[in-house]
């Protein structure tokens, strides 16, 4: 979270910086709301995590497989000439298969949220059709019900980590203020902590790595 605060501060400084008149960059703000679907592959699909509680009792935490997830995508940001800087937020709850569980059909409700910062450069600016490429950094949380098993008891568990994003999008301006924005975002994620009430918060060694590919279509309003 400290990294996110530093990056957010840098974005605010960039947005508020005023160039000399001959080097002035046009500035505008935007908000967008979209819907997308993402697929993922990685350690979440393959293995359970073993651990011990304070009494030395061994148990297992089974992560959700996260094979297919639908999610809204909310963004707020600023345009500085051909550059765009934004905060993004995604949140969704869906039923997911639990990986490496004795009952292969076992499913549980899984809550996934991601908060991040993105920076893109828009080719062909200021035309009505623009192609953007950029990078992002985000904080991720994945929580499922009853996936930690110690003896015969089950507990909720939450995986926490970060991700680097690679972004490609298209802006098609229907009017001067409204555009359609299809996008592809690839998140390379690492989860370094897991929390459940039986073991509190444990550092994961090695980390759990998971790749997400998210495709979205958004409506953006620029002002």
Regions found by a protein language model. Give the residues of each.
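Cleavable N-terminal export/targeting peptides
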Residues: 1-27
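Residue-level detector of intrinsically disordered/flexible regions characterized by low predicted structural confidence
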Residues: 4-7, 138, 187
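Alpha-helical transmembrane segments and their juxtamembrane interfaces
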Residues: 12-15, 83, 186
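Short glycine/proline- and aromatic-enriched beta-strand/turn motifs that initiate or cap beta-hairpins
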Residues: 20-85, 214-223
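Gram-negative (and chloroplast) outer-membrane scaffold detector with strong preference
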Residues: 39, 72-151, 155-164, 172-176, ...
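Predominantly the C-terminal beta-signal and adjacent terminal strand-loop region
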Residues: 44-48, 59-61, 94, 98, ...
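Extracytoplasmic loops and strand-loop junctions of Gram-negative outer membrane beta-barrel proteins
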Residues: 53-60, 100-103, 149-154, 198-203
């Amino acid at each position: 979270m400290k990294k996110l605060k530093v990056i957010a501060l840098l974005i605010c400084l960039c947005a508020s910086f005023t160039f000399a008149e001959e080097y002035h960059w046009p500035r505008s703000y935007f908000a967008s709301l979209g819907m997308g679907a993402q697929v993922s592959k990685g350690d979440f699909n393959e293995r359970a995590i073993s651990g011990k509680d304070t009494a030395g009792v061994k148990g297992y935490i089974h992560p959700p497989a996260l094979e297919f997830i639908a999610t809204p995508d909310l963004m707020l940001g600023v345009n500085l000439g051909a550059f765009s800087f934004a905060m993004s937020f995604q949140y969704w709850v869906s039923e997911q298969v639990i990986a490496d569980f004795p009952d292969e059909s076992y499913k549980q409700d899984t809550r996934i949220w991601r908060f991040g910062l993105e920076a893109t450069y828009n080719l062909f600016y200021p035309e009505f059709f623009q192609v953007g490429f950029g990078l992002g950094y985000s904080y991720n949380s994945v929580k499922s019900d009853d996936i930690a098993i110690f003896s015969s008891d089950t507990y909720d568990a939450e995986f926490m980590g970060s991700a680097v994003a690679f972004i490609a999008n298209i802006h098609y301006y229907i009017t001067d203020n409204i555009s359609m924005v299809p996008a592809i975002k690839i998140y390379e994620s690492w989860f370094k902590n897991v929390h459940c009430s039986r073991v509190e918060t444990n550092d994961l060694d090695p980390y759990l790595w998971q790749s997400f590919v998210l495709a979205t279509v958004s409506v953006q309003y620029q002002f």
